[in-house]
Structures are given as C-alpha cells and as structure tokens.
Amino acid sequence: MDGAILKAGATNVVRGVSAPLPELAYIYTHSDAVACVCETFDLLSNMIKGPGFVGENGEKPKLVVVMYPQGKSGAEIAAELGIDVPVKTMDELLAMGDSTKFREVAVTEDDACTLLYTSGTTGKPKGVVLSHGNLMQGLIYNEFSDQALEPIPGETLLSILPCWHVFERMAEYHALSRGAGLVYSSVKTFKKDLTRHRPHVLVAVPRLFESLYDGITGKLADSKGVKKLIVLIVRRASMALVDARRTLSNRRIMTTPEEGEAYLRRPAAVKALSTLKARVVQALATPIVAVGDKLVWSKVREGLGGRLKCLVSGGSQLAVNLDNFFEMVGLNIIVGYGLTETSPVICNRVIEDNIPGSVGKPPRDTEIVVRDVESGEVLGRMRHGHGKDTDMTTTGKIGVIYARGPQVMAGYYKGEEDTRKAFDSDGFFCTGDLGMVDPVTGALFLTGRAKDTIVLMNGENVEPQPIEEVLVASDLVDQVMLVGQDRKSIAALVVVSPAGLAARDALVSPVELAAWKAALPASPKEPTPDPELLAAASATLNGRPEVVEAVLAEVKRLIREAPCGFQAWEQVARVHLILEPFTMENGLMTQTLKIKRDVVATQYVREIEAMYGSR
C-alpha cells in the first residue's frame, strides 16, 4: 500500500493502530488527507463511533480501505457502520487494479513523499514532511559495510519494528532496493522466526537486543559444573581479545572528552607498552577463543538462525555492554543515529570502522556540527564521515548536535514557526541531542539531551514536563524530575514533602518531621541549613520499603488518573526519594527556577544507576 501510494504520486501519512483515537483524528484532519486506510474493521468502527475522519471544513473521505475486513465486503462495512463514503476491502481494491490502466505520474525529488507525525511532544504532534529526495539519500548512501556485507538478492531481513516508523521503513526500503526479502515478525513469534527464516540482517531498537542479551546470558549462567567453567573462561578470554583488537585498531571507547585528550597526550613509551600488551593478549587469547567459539559462541549464533551477518541498532543509544557482548559472540552490530526529521540517518557505523559506544560518522553529503549550548561556538565538525572524503575537526568538547544534508526535512507541515525554530541561520537542523566528536576515533558520541525529551530504549519519546506537573499536585511531592534516557522505562527523582509524609499514615514521626523541616531552606533562593542531615535522612527514607512503595503508588495513581491520558511507556516504574530540594543556591535550579536536568542527573548519577540496577 505504501509503495502504491507513492507510485501514484500521492503523499501518505502513516501512524500505528495503537495511537489514541483523538490523535488519529487530529492527524487525519491536520494533514488534509482525502482517504484513509485502516488495518482492521475494528479500528474503523472505533473511529466512526468516536472522533471520526473529518477534514478541516467537514469534508468526508473520498475512499476508505480496510485491509483485514473480517470476512465483510466494503459495502457491508459501510452499511453496518452507517457511513455514506466508498469503502473497499484490500481484495476489492486489488480487483479494481486489474481492470484499471495505470497512469504514469512524474515525481521529482522535491515532491512530498510522506508525512510523519512526531510522538511524545507537548501539545499537538508535528507533521514532518519528507520528500522523495530525502528518502533516496538514505537508500543510496546509507551502508552497513564498505565491502561485501550489504544485503544481496536472495537474502532476508527480519522486520519486527512498527513498519510506519521511519527507521524501520528506511531499513525495508534499503533491503528491497538491494533485492533482499522481508519477513514480518512480532514479539510473540520472534524467537521462532529467527530459526525458521534464518535472517541475514536484523534491524531493531536496543531494547530488543537487550532482550536477546538477557536470554542468552541467562542460559549461559544456568550452566552447571565443567560447562559453567568453560563458559566463564570463554567469556573472559573473548572480552580480553575484543579489548586487545580495539586497542590495536584504535577503536577504544572514549566516554569523556578528558579521557580522549589524555589518550592523545600519552607518552610514546606508554603507547608502545599498550600496543605490546595488546599484542601479547591477542596472541594468548586467540587460540582459547577459537576453541571457545566452537564450544559456545557458534551455538549462540545458530540459535539466532545461523546466518546473521549484521545487526543494525537504532532509535536510541546502544549500551556498551551490548556492543561488547555481540562482538564477543562474533556478530557484527552497527548503529545508526538520527531523527524522524532527518529521514532518519545522519550518522552511522560501518563494519570496517565500527567504533563501539559511538554512533559513527555521517554518510555522504552530510555535515554534522557540534555547538556550545550557550555561545553557539563550533566545538566539532564532521563531513563525509566514511571513506576518502572524511573532513573532521574537533575540540573534543560536548555540545548540541546540528545536521545538514539531503536527508533533512524541509520543514513541518503547517508549522512555519516550528520550522524556523528547528534550523539555524546556516540551514543546520538542531537535533536537541548532546554529543562530541571524539578526537581519537573521529566518531560522534552521544552524551545526553539538550532538550527535555527523554528517548527510551524502545525508541519512544517521553516529554517529562506534563507528567511532572501532574505529580507535583500531590501533597507527598514537592519537586520531581523524570529520568530514563536510553533505559527500558521511566524513573523519578522525587523531592518529598516531610509534612505530606507525616500526614500519610504516619510514614515519618513527629520528631523526624521537626528535624527535617528545620534543615530545609526557606525558599529556592536560600541555602540549605543542614544538607548533611537531609542526605542522611534521604538514605533512611529510601531504606524504608513502606515509604518508597507509598510514594511510588501515589505517583502511579496520579499518572493513571490524569485527564490527558498518558501512554503505557510514560508510566513511572521506580522512584528515589530526596529531602534536600533543588534550589538556585545548590546549583540545581536556574535563575528562572527551572530544574537543571543535566546537573541533577550528574549529582544523582549513583542513585539513578541504583534505581535501574546493572544494565
């Protein structure tokens, strides 16, 4: 259906069936759609009974297509739902095509191809207009490999992501353009599909790769006796070999600018010693890993179908432990980075230049600039990241990532002001992500978000402010900051109200209440009288399960009962309780009394890690 609409020269607007009905209705109206395609009869029925499909001036659809009509004809569906617009099933539509001569339509690279509405934003979704030229750039220049590991005719890509998502959609276009086939899977059938269809390429979000990792390592951990010892030796030897190879190929992970600078400034003797050590480790570990591969890793690969030559991750940051594990197993895993507005890839790793922990380098005709958050000073620049055309300069400092290239959208549909804000004076699109161009490897590393938006491991976006506004209405909560970037779920740092806790089933004693209130600042602009006491008291609170559970239950209730109706992925799964408030004086709030999210996240990094446990 997607290809047919584009072939006809029309523009399609895609959205998942799980989207709220009011959102679907808004998108239909805002996009000026003239027809609609519904996956199921039930979806169409719910829309007709609910908000309906109505144009801005009350226009009805010219055509409704139902892909899975539950045995009904189009006429029967129209009669049952009481709608006076043409309704066709997919089979009926195909039959119409048999007797209709196709008229060729001239399409240019600047013509609108698809309209994608961003999710998880405050207010109404924004419609991203992507042209044929935007998508063609990705088809031509996005590569898995500089050599022979690209999909070829006869090979298979296993698809498990929503097909309307720009990442999955471009992956499918990429495979089809190379003559490869597609297998559509689901969470329920994924494990069977791996062994049944034995794909060559798997494209997914980090959450799925983490599920694979958990399943595989869980089985390995269940090994007994000699087998358990063999697994332990093989894992340690494999990781040692991976580290040695990374050192020798200059693929070391640099997690901070300071680490990269220190690496570059190493004395010659230290460099030589590091190289010698890596060569010795490589020589010792290689035969052990060769045997271990036959005993352990080959069986892991066979359990994943036995033919996987490339894993492609995108949608959010890939955890380093996943990078490490799949490299140990002997599977190539690469990462793409971008947004809906950039079609989506503006940086990617290729197998021959696969820097772990990074998102790689820009494809052809793409420029990346890293600017200082406050001054706008250029801290790093990348162009034509792969191959002979590489052009990179960097200070190694962290800033906001901007992108310019043929894959970047022209703008938002009916959103002139949003479009103006999204681009700088040089035509670079602001991603809202923080990162640095690593001076050692020349790769782009993501370090966080300049905007408040939280991107979960499954690729879903969460805007924290609307949720936080709901939570501070509770008498238990004075302040709250949501966290969860590149995690499975949302968690919350909750500055609790001592008085609120005391009023709720005596969660704290009158003596504690009096002591804690005396240690609190009178206002956000004044210093905290006794931060040490509050820190100790916070530890006490977090050590009381009944208190933590009471606050978490309150948080979940408020989100569940919120009139705006939050999505499943916007639910808070964990909380950490804090007594010392975020203030200007302790550096955790701006002069306009906004929480400095990056500063708070840094100060409470241990508490955040403890909420999530080991990744």
Feature names for model-found ranges:
Residues 479-483, 520-530, 556-615:
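Conserved C-terminal "lid"/linker of ANL adenylate-forming enzymes
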Residues 113-139:
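Conserved AMP-binding A3 loop
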Residues 136-159, 163-273, 277-298, 307:
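Conserved AMP-binding/adenylation subdomain of ANL enzymes
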Residues 87-88, 95-117, 124, 150-156:
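Conserved pre-ATP/AMP-binding loop-to-beta segment of ANL
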Residues 9, 408-409, 422-423, 443-472, ...:
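Adenylate-forming
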Residues 377-379, 385-456:
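Conserved ATP-binding/catalytic segment of the ANL
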Residues 7-92:
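Structural core segment of the AMP-binding/adenylate-forming
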Residues 19-52, 138-157, 188-201, 303, ...:
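Conserved ATP-dependent adenylate/AMP-binding module captured primarily in the ANL superfamily
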